[in-house]
Amino acid sequence: MKRAFVTGGSGFVGGALIEALRGRGVEVVALARSDDAAAKVTALGATVARGDLDSVDVEDLRGCDVVFHSAALTKEHGTLAEHRKVNVEGTRAIVEAAQRAGVPRFVHVSTEAVLADGHPILRADENVPYPARPAGPYPISKGEAERLVLAANRAGFATVIIRPRFIWGAGDTSVLPQIVEMVKRGRFAWIGGGHHLTSTCNVSNVVEGALLAAERGAAGEIYFLTDGAPVEFRAFLTKLLATRGVTARERTVPKWVARLVAATTAWMRTPPVTKTAIALVGHEVTVVDDKARAQLGYASRVSIDEGLARMQTPSVSS
């Protein structure tokens, strides 16, 4: 791999990908739709391609060996139309641009959320079918995006999908900051006590899996990625919050109450809880990454303890 194109490069996963690629000496072209995004990817060593997913210049993709598509609308609320615009139509646009540019490989960063329908997910593998009724706009749109990417796979254009579960780690600009803010405002509660199991995937392990998918992933295949053995959600999140110097209150909300609140406040622009959030963190969600380990040589090299240590700020660790 000599040249790669990255979407979502100013975000959590995309930024980590750029950093890893540049560390390997790979030339990186990163899509940026704003001055702020352009500044971020430039600081990471990427060449800026100005535009949005639906307006990318095909010339910026020419000569690239692979596209890493990590850009997505990941919020738990919002309309289906909003999510489809970015996650489905945006994916369609970048896939078509990559095909026109003659890029031979396309790695799509997806999520275990494509299987979320409100029921626990127990040690799911890549053979589990998409649910009939996904739990909200985000799972719906990401599932549709996956189908689109798989359908685009053909001779000369190999598409590979990775599904990391609960991405976390140093540099998180999305999930953890939101949870920290909820805790600080007294709006956080453990759904059902939080003592269920969860799979997790440190951002460094996501990057490891993405790079391996680009190098060794079988065309038209999906690979789950995790940190290894599942952990108790409450214990893990407590440690994660501690890296920010924050402790969650003991308050617990029964799952049926959370579901009722989600149903009655779904009309709000920013509801206190959503059915998507409940589906993803309100009960067990565990997946197995045996396929990635066997076929890609994936090893989740960063342990949870090491990942937490990397997140410690001087003020917290002193």
What positions do the PLM features span?
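NAD(P)H-binding glycine-rich loop region in Rossmannoid oxidoreductase-like domains
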Residues: 37-42, 46-93, 97, 117
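N-terminal Rossmann NAD(P)H-binding glycine-rich loop of SDR-like oxidoreductase domains
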Residues: 4-24
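Glycine/proline-rich active-site loop of Rossmann-fold NAD(P)-dependent oxidoreductases
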Residues: 143, 157, 168-178, 204, ...
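Conserved Rossmann-fold NAD(P)-dependent oxidoreductase catalytic core, especially the SDR/UDP-sugar
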Residues: 89, 93-137
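Catalytic helix-loop patch of NAD(P)-dependent Rossmann-fold dehydrogenases
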Residues: 85, 120-167
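Mid/C-terminal beta-alpha module of Rossmann-like enzyme folds, strongest
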Residues: 212-273, 305-310
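Amphipathic terminal alpha-helices
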Residues: 290-294, 299-318
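NAD(P)-dependent short-chain dehydrogenase/reductase
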Residues: 152-161, 165-205, 240
